[in-house]
């Protein structure tokens, strides 16, 4: 590849003013790239801020519609729902109950805000007494028993209005059985966004407070991925695509930009990246202390995720980013 030499080649010529920089800009972040996470909890008339995530709230079902309308009115096309039930049990049965927290939220949102695209997180950690992502056996998650419960959960979500389901538990074979369950129940049109490369990350701390989903014992390293592994991430992604994933995800995003890029180069399905709670809270905390320009660092972070190859980004910054776009700050 010939790139030219100085002095005949001067890259600064194309940085001389904002107009030329706009013309040659390679990566663009738009409203169409954003998905906003929303926490729905039990109770009534509840709007409570998550202490470790300034600006992020938990909503009761009767209050969640206002939050969704705000997202819709900003031009953000999609939300992803996480539920916090009143009652937990050993298997997380609220996840497939007709009166489960997600089911009630889905019905209300789809009735009152039908033009928002609703993705549901499909897992068990928020719903089990032990905080792990499935059925326990000998102090570990039993993979195949968990698959049976996942099938019940996704069909229930689809019946109550989910536009897309997003299994996040990192169970082997989960995409295959979910696709089969949806198809058999008459939901062949419902896509699957698989949390394909989900790492056992320390960046999840604030989320576990928000969703009340911290494990009661041990950790999740027997099912979530080792942060040291890159080739294994690609293996997980390719297996999910073969099993029927319509979208694949890398989580977290910022510390795993290399994984996003590798996945993008090796699959033909859209790639989602999850800009997780710890990434959000780090920027919020440093911004509050005046150590960084919060808006600029937030924008640069999201832009880096898009540049790495993400086709869509789940981010708690979605509303902030949308306002910057609308107000012409970028």
From Swiss-Prot:
The active site is at 198 (schiff-base intermediate with substrate), 251 (schiff-base intermediate with substrate). Catalyzes an early step in the biosynthesis of tetrapyrroles. Binds two molecules of 5-aminolevulinate per subunit, each at a distinct site, and catalyzes their condensation to form porphobilinogen. One of its GO terms (biological process) is protoporphyrinogen IX biosynthetic process. This is Delta-aminolevulinic acid dehydratase. PANTHER family: DELTA-AMINOLEVULINIC ACID DEHYDRATASE. Its EC number is 4.2.1.24. It catalyses: 2 5-aminolevulinate = porphobilinogen + 2 H2O + H(+). Mg(2+) binds at residue 236. It comes from Aquifex aeolicus (strain VF5). CDD domains: ALAD_PBGS. GO terms for cellular component: cytosol. Its cofactor is Zn(2+). The gene is hemB. InterPro entries: ALAD (IPR001731), ALAD_AS (IPR030656), Aldolase_TIM (IPR013785).
């Amino acid at each position: 590849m010939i790139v030219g030499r100085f002095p005949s080649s001067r890259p600064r010529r194309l940085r001389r003013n904002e107009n030329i920089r706009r013309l040659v800009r390679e990566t663009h972040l738009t409203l169409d790239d954003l998905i906003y996470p929303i926490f729905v909890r039990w109770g009534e008339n509840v709007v409570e801020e998550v202490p470790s995530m300034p600006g992020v709230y938990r909503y009761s079902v009767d209050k969640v519609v206002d939050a969704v309308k705000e997202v819709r009115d900003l031009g953000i096309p999609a939300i992803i729902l996480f539920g916090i039930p009143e009652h937990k049990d050993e298997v997380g049965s609220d996840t497939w109950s007709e009166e489960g927290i997600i089911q009630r939220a889905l019905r209300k949102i789809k009735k009152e805000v039908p033009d928002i695209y609703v993705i549901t997180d499909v897992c068990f950690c928020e719903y089990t007494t032990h905080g792990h992502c499935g059925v326990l056996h000998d102090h570990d998650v039993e993979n195949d028993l968990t698959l049976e419960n996942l099938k019940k959960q996704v069909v229930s979500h689809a019946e109550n209005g989910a536009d897309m389901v997003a299994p996040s538990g990192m169970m082997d074979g989960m995409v295959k059985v979910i696709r089969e369950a949806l198809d058999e129940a008459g939901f062949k049109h419902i896509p699957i966004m698989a949390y394909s490369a989900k790492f056992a990350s320390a960046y999840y701390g604030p989320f576990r407070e928000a969703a009340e989903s911290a494990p009661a014992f041990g950790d999740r390293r027997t099912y979530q991925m080792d942060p040291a592994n890159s080739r294994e991430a690609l293996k997980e992604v390719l297996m999910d695509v073969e099993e029927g994933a319509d979208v694949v995800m890398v989580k977290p995003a910022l510390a795993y930009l290399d994984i996003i890029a590798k996945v993008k180069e090796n699959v033909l399905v859209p790639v989602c990246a999850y800009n997780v709670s710890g990434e959000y809270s780090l920027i919020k905390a440093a911004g509050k202390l005046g150590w960084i320009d919060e808006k600029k660092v937030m924008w640069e972070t999201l832009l880096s995720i898009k540049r790495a190859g993400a086709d869509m980004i789940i981010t708690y910054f979605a509303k902030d980013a949308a306002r910057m776009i609308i107000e012409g700050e970028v």
